[in-house]
Regions:
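C-terminal engagement/docking regions of AAA+ P-loop ATPases
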Residues: 2-24, 98-100, 104-107, 321-373
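Dynamic helix-loop-helix/coil hinge segments at AAA+ ATPase domain boundaries and subdomain interfaces
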Residues: 37-70, 128-131, 144, 274, ...
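Conserved C-terminal "switch" segment of AAA+ ATPases
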Residues: 39-47, 60-61, 117-118, 219-310
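Pre-Walker A (pre-P-loop) alpha-helix and adjacent loop at the N terminus of AAA/AAA+ ATPase modules
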Residues: 47-91, 335-345
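Conserved Walker
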Residues: 79-85, 89, 148, 152-161, ...
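Walker A/P-loop
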Residues: 83-123
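AAA+/P-loop NTPase substrate/partner-engagement loops
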Residues: 112-143
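Conserved AAA+/SF3 P-loop NTPase catalytic/coupling segment centered on the Walker-B
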Residues: 130-134, 138, 161-190, 203, ...
Length: 373
């Protein structure tokens, strides 16, 4: 029966968590003996392939090698299951300009771990700009309507994740929430639990990867990589020295916006770079591959020549607005003309052909399409 299977699965998770807590109180010699009894196989609550997960993430998020390496390091430690079992698995703050892939990393992780890009709990912090909106996280206080129900924005099933794979929660655009809302997360960072204001229940984050995104210090990050003097600094070999100063600049901006105790509880602050023009062609190719997945239901696929890819990458690049601006340009210059072409031309049905290739090429500076003869 389904409910018995769910109960059994929950019992297994509770047993794994209890074992992790008990391991912390064991003598080191007992831990070594436990590992020896496992016949050189590390016993872990988690069963996922770090390399396979990162391959998916790297295919989806381009131009952020340093940030993705930091995430891979974290997943390696999580997979080994050697983290403090009384805290969330990991808390990270993603900083960078808009449109550089901060949220896309979380979606790619959810897809790689759980098979669904939406298999994570997302809290849009820009909707919690007023201090009384902290109730959306901690529930209504005792005596208020809905206190006993304990309704919040969290879903414990998403926080728990799936069997052998951690859950994911994203607090998006953290800087737009009121200070009271962000302070409500301190207990989550400390011991992995969020007790509701009513005291009726708690949400457990101890099996969860906690991510936050923010555009704070975006100007400093952009100037560091692509400012007017960036090329000169690279030429003179001064880029490394400026890179060393960047974490200090970012930290000062964080402390101005958030309390020191809040910043001090974040495990890692990951800086995302502005999207450089050299990455543009790879982003275009990624978007075309996604478009081809959507075109599969029409039994056709799109193939662009190098000139079209170069045109989209160069003319669609926008330093300030990142990949989103490029995607809008692709929508206007490629997807709209392609849709008009598909509606105005007969595409052979499945009985006539398995998959038809639509070729895209430049003609007098505009993208044109044609079917093979």
């Amino acid at each position: 029966m389904p409910f018995l299977n769910d109960l059994l699965e929950q019992t297994r998770r509770d047993a794994s968590s209890s074992a992790a807590l008990n391991a912390e109180n064991c003598h080191p010699r007992a831990i070594v003996e436990t590992h020896q009894r496992s016949e050189d196989t590390l016993q872990s609550r988690f069963r996922f392939d770090v390399a396979a997960v990162m391959q998916v993430v790297r295919n989806e998020v381009l131009g952020q090698d340093e940030a993705l390496q930091a995430i891979e390091d974290v997943l390696t430690v999580v997979r080994a299951d050697i983290l403090d079992p009384r805290r969330p698995l990991f808390t990270a703050l993603f900083l960078g300009p808009t449109g550089v892939g901060k949220t896309e990393v979380v979606r790619a992780l959810a897809r790689a771990l759980h098979g669904d890009a939406d298999a994570y709990c997302r809290v849009d912090m820009n909707t919690l700009a007023q201090e009384h909106y902290a109730a959306a996280l901690t529930g209504a206080p005792p005596g208020y309507a809905g206190a006993k129900e304990g309704r919040t924005l969290f879903d414990q099933a998403l926080l728990d994740g799936s069997q052998g794979r951690p859950g994911i929660v994203l607090f998006d655009e953290l800087e737009k929430a009121s200070k009271e809302v962000s302070q409500a997360l301190l207990n989550v960072f400390d011991n992995g639990l969020l007790r509701l204001a009513s005291g009726e229940k708690s949400f457990n984050f101890r099996n969860t990867l906690v991510f936050m995104t923010s555009n704070l210090a975006a100007d400093e990050i952009r100037q560091h990589r692509l400012g007017p003097l960036a090329s000169l600094r690279r030429l003179l070999g001064l880029q490394a020295a400026r890179r060393e100063r960047l974490p200090g600049l970012v930290r000062r901006r964080l402390v101005k916006r958030f309390s020191a105790e809040f910043v001090n509880r974040i495990d890692s602050t990951v800086v995302f770079n502005a999207i450089e023009q050299e990455v543009g062609e790879r982003i275009v190719e990624l978007e075309v591959s996604r478009l081809n997945r959507r075109l599969a239901k029409h039994h056709c696929r799109l193939q662009l020549d190098a000139a079209v890819v170069g045109k989209l990458a160069s003319e669609g690049h926008d330093l300030e607005f990142g990949a989103r601006a490029l995607k809008r340009f692709i929508r206007h210059e490629l997807e709209v003309p392609l849709a008009e072409y598909l509606l105005g031309n007969r595409i052979p049905c499945r009985a006539e052909v398995t998959c038809m290739t639509v070729a895209g090429h430049l003609e007098r500076g505009r993208i044109r399409f044609s079917l093979p003869t």
